[in-house]
């Protein structure tokens, strides 16, 4: 079927620049498809023709056919959309007045709350209600600032003046704080403008020979001259910075000059107090400690040799097994009451049939000074006894 005879293509002489698409159809840039072609696309679609076949028969691009059919299925219309236009205006004077009224009643009202209230009071319907972003734009442009009213030029100056005042106050506070040099020396710092002017003058008066802007000690001294520090304070600061770092103030060897007594007065008093405390701790007297507190007590040192002859309160004495050297009867009688223990050597019936080598497989245990007295041990190595005495 030849559609060119029934549906002539539009001319391009009066409507603008045109062209021929890949299918051989003629189109005009910026103009919609003619209504007769649109109607034919819908008719072929109702007949069950596929969009790709419609595109080839009518020589219209596949995207154009799909767009026309999609709009027809959604809205039932084959009319073209507005080209270069926008959505219908929702910010009508009535809506703007209502939004302004809501903001005057409640300045903290959110945009979504305004939108819900417009729908609740039937000022707008679902199609004409402005979006949240549109309401925010209306509030910024038309509610907070009335139309035809210029922005006051003094607002910028007010903001800048406030910021300058705040910065200057912060600078003044930091200069007068206790962590600065002025705060340590107890000097009242002048205004920030005076300090800035003096710094600028110092930079101009003291050029650096190598061309860099890093100041040296001479520049700092020249900068600090004037009302900031006196000559005596400058000398004190120079001595402090020339002093060797990490030096011990109690063992310094340099002689202290008369003008340096103020620097070391606090340090000397602290050192003197520490010396007195050391002396008091080294030689305590009953008068200093107090009569109610007992003095230091000394306890005898019990070595490994005499450990066998000592007992702890509440525990029975240590009695070595039979055949390994035992205590005499008077010794046991003096250590514990006779009614509790007998004078015969201690033996257990369970181990009566075993010899000593089975009960003590390690011969080193038999030579330990812990189990024997001085008489039963015999000639023991002096190094072992000495090592045990230390522990």
Curated annotation (Swiss-Prot):
Region (PAI subdomain): 19-75
Region Disordered, annotated ranges: 1-21, 182-218
Site (Breakpoint for translocation to form PAX5-FOXP1): 260-261
Post-translational modification: O-glycosylated.
InterPro entries: Homeodomain-like_sf, PAIRED_DNA-bd_dom, Paired_dom, Pax2_C, PAX_fam, WH-like_DNA-bd_sf
CDD domains cross-referenced by the UniProt entry: PAX
Residues within the DNA-binding region(s): 16-142
Keyword Iron-sulfur (UniProt): no
Keywords associated with the record: Chromosomal rearrangement, Developmental protein, Differentiation, Disease variant, DNA-binding, Glycoprotein, Neurogenesis, Nucleus, Paired box, Proto-oncogene, Spermatogenesis, Transcription, Transcription regulation
Region (RED subdomain): 94-142
GO molecular function: DNA-binding transcription activator activity, RNA polymerase II-specific; DNA-binding transcription factor activity, RNA polymerase II-specific; RNA polymerase II cis-regulatory region sequence-specific DNA binding
Gene Ontology cellular-component terms listed: chromatin; nucleoplasm
Residues carrying the site annotation Breakpoint for translocation to form PAX5-ETV6: 158-159
Localization per record: Nucleus
GO biological process terms held by the UniProt record: adult behavior; B cell differentiation; cerebral cortex development; embryonic cranial skeleton morphogenesis; lateral ventricle development; negative regulation of transcription by RNA polymerase II; nervous system development; regulation of transcription by RNA polymerase II
SUPFAM superfamilies the UniProt entry points to: Homeodomain-like
Purpose of the protein: Transcription factor that plays an essential role in commitment of lymphoid progenitors to the B-lymphocyte lineage. Fulfills a dual role by repressing B-lineage inappropriate genes and simultaneously activating B-lineage-specific genes. In turn, regulates cell adhesion and migration, induces V(H)-to-D(H)J(H) recombination, facilitates pre-B-cell receptor signaling and promotes development to the mature B-cell stage. Repression of the cohesin-release factor WAPL causes global changes of the chromosomal architecture in pro-B cells to facilitate the generation of a diverse antibody repertoire.
Illness: A chromosomal aberration involving PAX5 is a cause of acute lymphoblastic leukemia. Translocation t(9;18)(p13;q11.2) with ZNF521. Translocation t(9;3)(p13;p14.1) with FOXP1. Translocation t(9;12)(p13;p13) with ETV6.
Quaternary structure (record): Interacts with ETS1; this interaction alters PAX5 DNA-binding properties. Binds DNA as a monomer. Interacts with TBP; this interaction allows PAX5 to interact with the basal transcription machinery. Interacts with RB1. Interacts with TLE4. Interacts with DAXX. (Microbial infection) Interacts (via N-terminus) with Epstein-Barr virus protein BZLF1 (via C-terminus); this interaction inhibits BZLF1-mediated lytic viral reactivation. Interacts also with EBNA1; this interaction promotes EBNA1-dependent transcription.
Protein name from the UniProt record: Paired box protein Pax-5
Source species: Homo sapiens (Human)
Gene that specifies this protein: PAX5
